[in-house]
Each structure stands twice: as C-alpha cells, then as structure tokens.
Amino acid sequence: MGRGLRGVQGVPGAALSRPPTGGPDPGPGGWADLPLPAETADLRGDPEPHPALAPLLPLVGVWRGTGHGGYPTIADFDYGQQVRFAHDGRPFLHYESRAWLLGADGTVLRPAAREVGWWRPGAAAGEFEVLLAHPTGIVEIYLGRLRSPNQWELSTDVVARAATAKEVTGNRRLYGIVDGALLYAVDMAAVGQPLQPHLAARLERVDG
C-alpha cells in the first residue's frame, strides 16, 4: 500500500486512522446531527416545500438511469447517472449529479462527471435560475423558463472557468418528465466548436 496521506504535513494522523463509530451513516460531514431541518427529496414528508418552488416541484426526487454522449473532439460514450433534487423548505432546490462511464457490455468503468448547484425561482412567473459548479473548473449560471408544467429549458447566461479548465463558452439544457421518467438533452459550445448536441439521458425515479 502506498504512503497516501499519512504523515503529510497538515493532515492529522488521528483523523486518518479514526475507527468508524458504528450506527447509521450520519451523512457527508455529519450533516444529519446539525440543529437544522433536514433537506428532503421526498415531497410526501416534511418540511413543506416553499410556494415559490411550485414550477420546479416535479423535479424533486432521486433519479437514476443511463445516457449517451458525444462531441466532435471526443469518442462517443455511454454513462450511468444519478441526479438528486432536494429542498429544505426555502425557495430553492439543492441539485447534485454523479455519473460513471459504462463499457459496451454495461459494466462500470470509472467515475465521470459531477455537478452540484441550486435551482431558484426567477424574477417573473415561469422563469428560474440555475447555478452549477463542476470539478473540472467550470461554474455556470443558467436562465431558464418553464415550457410546460413538466418541461424546463435553460441556457447559460454566464460561464466562468479556472485557468486550468478547458474552454466552455455555452450550454443549453432541456429537461422533461415523460411517462414518469426524467429525460434531458444537453447542447454544448466548447473548445472552438459551436453549440451542438453533447448529452442525452433517461432517468427513472428511484426515490421521492
């Protein structure tokens, strides 16, 4: 086994070797024991969703499925994905997505894209805003509109990137719920290429 982080300056050895406490998983960083209402991805429980979230509420839940991606600068690929939309009673949705690359036979190859962010009601009826951060060094602000009670369209208003990130200049996304499943398509403009199809997936509700 490699040396890893043990003994690295600034990383306490006790923190790395602390035994598990047992019992239920307290969640990332022990968030479950904070003196705050827990967020939920299930509209059947507490807390009550904020009234301003009404146009976004069909998204609340945990969704999992598969998708396909491609771009002129890369080979086509298949991926699995889980997406979670949750709320804590305030007027925004907490969004998190994790994806993994799949082989031709459906086996999991390795972790892929991750996203975290917030979906917020906009200034006018039927409008909303989305803030997303990516570990690839990209941060995006989207402006969106409700196309129907179960369809949401959003396009980037701002794309900011770290000095080491690849060039991404714009994205457009369309989400829709069809026959109980969450479908989406993503168009991307990046690395000198114009806006064009990049991702498409179908996710089934697994919780909420």
Residue ranges and their predicted role:
Residues 135-140, 146-149, 153-172:
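Acidic, glycine-rich flexible loop segments
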Residues 98-103, 133-139, 159-160, 187-192:
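Short, solvent-exposed aromatic-acidic interface loops
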